[in-house]
């Protein structure tokens, strides 16, 4: 019996795959649990339509993410912090502080998406990576200066 998978199943295949299985396995396990539907012409057409819609939405989200990444790449965050004699900061600049500065410039990003190689503890120029989308990352320029 041929079925169209609705879920990723480890030993069978991925979503949308048409696989041949034993009739009992399909009738007693896959179909009742909603893991698959029977591979009829109608179901195959519905699957193709759903795939096209999903691909369209995915492309639209990806384009928005690329636009946001381009906006972030053009920004430079300037932060003034208390620092000691040799430029060592009292405390550290974290991704939470960077997220607040981005929000002030009109870009709202979750702090967990801002990745610093290590906490910023000295005056200088740094680059932070912002994961806008699983496939899109932007480099954010951060300039730390000493407060008077």
Swiss-Prot record:
User: Molecular function terms in GO for this entry?
Assistant: rRNA binding; structural constituent of ribosome
Arranged from A to Z, the UniProt key words for this protein are: Ribonucleoprotein, Ribosomal protein, RNA-binding, rRNA-binding
**SUPFAM superfamilies, per this entry?**
L9 N-domain-like, Ribosomal protein L9 C-domain
Q: Set out the biological process GO terms recorded for this chain's protein.
A: translation
This entry carries the following GO cellular component terms, namely: ribonucleoprotein complex; ribosome
Asked if the keyword RNA-binding belongs to this entry, the reply reads: yes
Q: Which is one Pfam family of this protein?
A: Ribosomal_L9_N
Family according to the record: Belongs to the bacterial ribosomal protein bL9 family.
* NCBIfam families in the record: L9
* Functional description taken from the UniProt entry: Binds to the 23S rRNA.
Q: What is the protein name for this chain?
A: Large ribosomal subunit protein bL9
The organism encoding this protein is: Geobacter metallireducens (strain ATCC 53774 / DSM 7210 / GS-15)
Read off the lineage from the record: Bacteria, Pseudomonadati, Thermodesulfobacteriota, Desulfuromonadia, Geobacterales
